[in-house]
Design a protein with these regions (language model features):
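Short acidic (Asp/Glu) and glycine-rich catalytic loops that position anionic groups and cofactors
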Residues: 49-51, 230-231, 257-263, 290-299
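N-terminal accessory/capping or targeting/presequence segment of soluble
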Residues: 1-73, 83, 87, 91-230, ...
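Divalent metal-coordination and catalytic microenvironments
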Residues: 26, 80, 280
């Protein structure tokens, strides 16, 4: 879900390289004669040097564009495998356009090769969904869905697919518990103009919430293709910046038309109602108190001892 906080079962970059930062790209070469690459931004350059073997990896500072730079070092690389579940549509479009002149071919797959060698991979924990009472958010999910449905219709489409757990959690007034610090519900959604919603989850379905009824259906991710067959010939809205590449091939396979839209749920949720504004102020007070307690503790530390950011 392209989140900076991952479950242990998603930490493929850490497994293959020992890099434990929250953002990064990996390019793993097939030949032992060529170094692989680890790419992350300036926040993690010192951490990369500590955690990653520079005998095995080239460490690059930046983002997706550094993959191009790495491939310029090793011009003998002509075929690149891509996990279409771990790259967004626009990210792939960028790579494709930049590498076209280099005659590099892509091998697209929904299987991840790291998973193939990851013995004793951590299991995905059971997800429990908590419903957030309207008194805390100021608008029930039925009203929010109705507003979203109008946007879908105004774009001459039948449905929206979104891979943004924060947007889905806001829309349906729900929270999840799979991540330690980010209480979103990890799923993706197919939201139809008829107001019927399919929520797709990894492996075991979550413990039931009041949402799991006729109009909102909890479904396993492996049913995505079969669900799409129901909508053949329709037109979908897709956010190319947050939707993984495999979705496009699934839509094409089921003869569903699609077009790009910046996630309309994100646009809706950024405008806070009066209840949300009031509760934001209360949360800021709690947050401020926590900071004051921390600062008091910090001020009373024994200054004769050496402390660094890792200790703190």
């Amino acid at each position: 879900f392209f989140s900076e906080e991952l479950m242990e079962s998603d930490e493929r970059l850490k497994f293959i390289s020992n890099f434990s930062g929250s953002a990064g790209w990996g390019v793993i070469t097939a030949s032992h004669k060529l170094k692989s690459a680890i790419i992350s931004d300036g926040r993690y350059q010192e951490q990369l040097k500590k955690e990653v073997s520079q005998k095995e990896f080239v460490i690059l500072d930046g983002g997706l564009n550094k993959i191009i730079e790495f491939l310029n070092l090793y011009k003998q690389i002509k075929i690149i495998g891509v996990d279409t579940k771990l790259i967004t549509i626009n990210q792939f479009k960028f790579l494709e356009s930049e590498l076209k002149i280099k005659n590099i071919k892509f091998m697209l797959s929904t299987k991840n090769l790291v998973d193939e060698i990851w013995n004793n991979k951590p299991t995905i924990p059971q997800q429990k969904i908590v419903d957030v009472d309207t008194k805390y958010v100021g608008e029930n999910f039925v009203s929010k869905i109705k507003r979203l449905s109008k946007i879908i219709l105004n774009h001459s489409s039948e449905a929206l697919i979104t891979f943004k757990p924060d947007a889905i959690s806001w829309l349906l007034n729900i929270r999840g518990n799979q991540l330690k610090y980010t209480p979103v519900v990890r799923c993706f959604a197919l939201i139809h103009k008829s107001k019927k919603i399919h929520l797709f989850f990894e492996h075991d379905l979550p413990q039931l919430s009041k949402l799991d009824h006729g109009e909102i259906i909890f479904t396993n991710m492996n049913k995505f293709q079969s669900i799409l067959k129901m909508f053949a010939g329709e037109s979908f809205l897709v956010d190319y910046n947050s939707t993984p590449l495999f979705v496009l091939s699934a839509l094409k396979k089921n003869k569903i038309k699609y077009k790009h839209i910046s996630c309309p749920i994100s646009s809706l949720k950024v405008i806070k109602n009066s209840v949300e504004q009031k509760n934001f102020k209360e949360v800021h007070k709690i947050d401020g108190l926590a900071f004051i307690k921390f600062w008091s503790w910090f001020e009373h530390l024994d200054k004769n001892n050496m402390f660094d950011e890792e200790y703190l």
